[in-house]
């Protein structure tokens, strides 16, 4: 089950970032979180959306003031994600074990 705070964060990221997909992964996706856990989000961005580092900075800025729990955000372009999700990578873990919370 996705927490209310995770839903709020994913909605804000969807509106501000315009991703192709948003995954929640890690302990919150596996329902094994504890008091010190953070949210882990993977944003699959359109291939023409620009530099991943700059996109990450924008994503973190968009969440200022709306979250209580720490958040980690990973940005990847769609073509890379689609290739890497079948290899032993973070993308495979996200694809297999993550929760797809948004898809365009």
Where are the regions a protein language model picked out?
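Catalytic core of pol beta-like nucleotidyltransferases
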Residues: 1-21, 29-35, 45-104
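Short beta-strand->loop micro-motif that forms the acidic, two-metal-ion catalytic signature
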Residues: 40-44
């Amino acid at each position: 089950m996705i927490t209310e705070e995770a839903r709020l964060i994913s909605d804000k990221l969807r509106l501000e970032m315009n991703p192709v997909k948003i995954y929640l992964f890690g302990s919150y996706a596996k329902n094994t979180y504890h008091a010190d856990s953070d949210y882990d989000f993977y944003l699959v961005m359109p291939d023409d959306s620009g530099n991943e580092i700059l996109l990450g900075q924008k994503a973190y800025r968009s969440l200022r003031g709306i979250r209580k729990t720490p958040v980690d955000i990973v940005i990847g372009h769609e073509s890379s994600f689609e290739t890497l999700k079948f290899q032993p990578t973070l993308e495979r873990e996200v694809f297999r074990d993550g929760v797809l919370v948004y898809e365009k």
